[in-house]
Amino acid sequence: MAGDSDSKLDNHAENEHVDWQPFLIGVAGGTASGKSSVCGKIMELLGQNKIDHHQRQVAILSQDSFYRVLTPEQKAKALKGQFNFDHPDAFDNELIVKTLCEIMEGRTVQIPVYDFVTHSRKEETVTVYPADVVLFEGILMFYSQEIRDLFQMKLFVDTDADTRLSRRVLRDISERGRDLEQVLNQYITFVKPAFEEFCLPTKKYADVIIPRGADNLVAINLIVQHIQDFLNGGLTKRLNGCLNGHTPRKRHPSESSSRPH
């Protein structure tokens, strides 16, 4: 019967949608190791950084967006450079897990925006639409097993301590309104010990270690090739679905991979 046939096609199409999942890549490494630069280079080599947002197949998220909301006492400490932002408890892991699960289900998600000058979440959020590949970078991306196990590929950006410190000093002074003494005190008191205790031990979970960060084009090109193979395989699967009368995942023309809300 036509009704039964239509029902079977609908069910099959629904199953095709359920079977589809984005490729989640975790990118960890010490502070100012070049995680964002590596993600940006991957986007560039994939040709994703200069195309229309609604055609973008790759999205980038940062663990920095998921700092917990501080109490008044914690915020007062933070403004004096006395709060440890490199400790696992500084991050809202529950929200990270919830966001990643929604991304895996192909949903549009709202990402918090963190203000590093005032140490607070802004009222606005960033809208991230469904993408085929999602890069999620942060200093402690692999610390929580629950989060770590969600990634199909794990990268660790390995940069020497002197380079990371010099980059952090320049960044925090120019972008975050800190003075040199505060940056150095925070590094010695919190950043360096936290790296050695919480971040560095997670290096063992990485599938690929990238020395020298974005300067290591050999490693990045290998990763890009792997992502391209995934994207091409996904495209073939969706095209086959169309040929068989199934409906692939669609994105509204007005949707972008990431934009302010």
UniProtKB/Swiss-Prot annotation:
<dbReference type="GO" id="GO:0005524">
    <property type="term" value="F:ATP binding"/>
</dbReference>
<keyword id="KW-0808">Transferase</keyword>
<feature type="binding site">
    <location>
        <position position="114"/>
    </location>
    <ligand>
        <name>substrate</name>
    </ligand>
</feature>
<keyword id="KW-0547">Nucleotide-binding</keyword>
<comment type="function">
    <text>Phosphorylates uridine and cytidine to uridine monophosphate and cytidine monophosphate. Does not phosphorylate deoxyribonucleosides or purine ribonucleosides. Can use ATP or GTP as a phosphate donor.</text>
</comment>
<keyword id="KW-0067">ATP-binding</keyword>
<dbReference type="InterPro" id="IPR027417">
    <property type="entry name" value="P-loop_NTPase"/>
</dbReference>
<feature type="binding site">
    <location>
        <position position="178"/>
    </location>
    <ligand>
        <name>substrate</name>
    </ligand>
</feature>
<comment type="similarity">
    <text>Belongs to the uridine kinase family.</text>
</comment>
<dbReference type="GO" id="GO:0044211">
    <property type="term" value="P:CTP salvage"/>
</dbReference>
<dbReference type="GO" id="GO:0005737">
    <property type="term" value="C:cytoplasm"/>
</dbReference>
<dbReference type="InterPro" id="IPR000764">
    <property type="entry name" value="Uridine_kinase-like"/>
</dbReference>
<dbReference type="InterPro" id="IPR006083">
    <property type="entry name" value="PRK/URK"/>
</dbReference>
<comment type="pathway">
    <text>Pyrimidine metabolism; UMP biosynthesis via salvage pathway; UMP from uridine: step 1/1.</text>
</comment>
<feature type="binding site">
    <location>
        <position position="119"/>
    </location>
    <ligand>
        <name>substrate</name>
    </ligand>
</feature>
<feature type="binding site">
    <location>
        <position position="168"/>
    </location>
    <ligand>
        <name>substrate</name>
    </ligand>
</feature>
<protein>
    <recommendedName>
        <fullName>Uridine-cytidine kinase 2-A</fullName>
        <ecNumber>2.7.1.48</ecNumber>
    </recommendedName>
</protein>
<comment type="subunit">
    <text>Homotetramer.</text>
</comment>
<feature type="binding site">
    <location>
        <begin position="29"/>
        <end position="37"/>
    </location>
    <ligand>
        <name>ATP</name>
    </ligand>
</feature>
<feature type="binding site">
    <location>
        <position position="215"/>
    </location>
    <ligand>
        <name>ATP</name>
    </ligand>
</feature>
<dbReference type="Pfam" id="PF00485">
    <property type="entry name" value="PRK"/>
</dbReference>
<dbReference type="GO" id="GO:0004849">
    <property type="term" value="F:uridine kinase activity"/>
</dbReference>
<dbReference type="GO" id="GO:0044206">
    <property type="term" value="P:UMP salvage"/>
</dbReference>
<feature type="binding site">
    <location>
        <position position="86"/>
    </location>
    <ligand>
        <name>substrate</name>
    </ligand>
</feature>
<feature type="binding site">
    <location>
        <position position="186"/>
    </location>
    <ligand>
        <name>substrate</name>
    </ligand>
</feature>
<comment type="pathway">
    <text>Pyrimidine metabolism; CTP biosynthesis via salvage pathway; CTP from cytidine: step 1/3.</text>
</comment>
<dbReference type="GO" id="GO:0043771">
    <property type="term" value="F:cytidine kinase activity"/>
</dbReference>
<keyword id="KW-0418">Kinase</keyword>
